[in-house]
From Swiss-Prot:
Entry's Gene Ontology molecular function annotations: actin monomer binding
CDD domains cross-referenced by the UniProt entry: PROF
Coiled-coil regions listed in the entry: none
Main location: cytoplasm
Other information: The variability of the residues taking part of IgE-binding epitopes might be responsible of the difference in cross-reactivity among olive pollen cultivars, and between distantly related pollen species, leading to a variable range of allergy reactions among atopic patients.
General function of this protein: Binds to actin and affects the structure of the cytoskeleton. At high concentrations, profilin prevents the polymerization of actin, whereas it enhances it at low concentrations.
Taxonomic lineage from the root: Eukaryota, Viridiplantae, Streptophyta, Embryophyta, Tracheophyta
Motif (Involved in PIP2 interaction): 84-100
Annotated organism of origin: Olea europaea (Common olive)
Entry annotated with the keyword Transmembrane: no
Protein name: Profilin-3
PTM summary: Phosphorylated by MAP kinases.
Length: 134
């Protein structure tokens, strides 16, 4: 399966039991910041934004004072899982980033999608990739 198929079929799909509810944008990005696959709506990000995210995975709490920035959008960092998941909130939407062995699985959402639904979609694919050694 191509990386694009993972984004299209597993991240940008309808959320279980909620037809028509789906993430606003999603991507799979290598630890080096290279985009493996992304939705057409995923924001173009700066290398320093990805560096900040990777630093937060290695040093949890790094982004808390300044916020998580992606594609010029600032998210307030909320409770995640140290070294594994970073979550951010902005207004009625937010972002979930799950770290795997080689990649970051990113999902961005707006209402009516809930934070929990975004977490479920992103973390399920991230956990699957971890099981596959990726």
């Amino acid at each position: 399966m191509s990386w694009q198929a993972y984004v299209d079929d597993h991240l940008m799909c309808d959320i279980e039991g909620h037809e028509g509810h789906r993430l606003t944008a999603a991507a799979i990005v290598g630890h080096d910041g290279s985009v493996w696959a992304q939705s057409a709506t995923f924001p173009q990000f700066k290398p320093e934004e990805m560096n900040g995210i990777m630093t937060d995975f290695n040093e949890p709490g790094h982004l808390a004072p300044t916020g998580l920035h992606l594609g010029g959008t600032k998210y307030m960092v909320i409770q995640g899982e140290a070294g594994a998941v970073i979550r951010g909130k902005k207004g009625s939407g937010g972002i979930t980033i799950k770290k795997t062995g080689q990649a970051l699985v990113c999902g961005i959402y707006e209402e009516p999608v809930t934070p929990g639904q975004c977490n479920m979609v992103v973390e399920r694919l991230g956990d699957y990739l971890l099981e596959q050694g990726l």
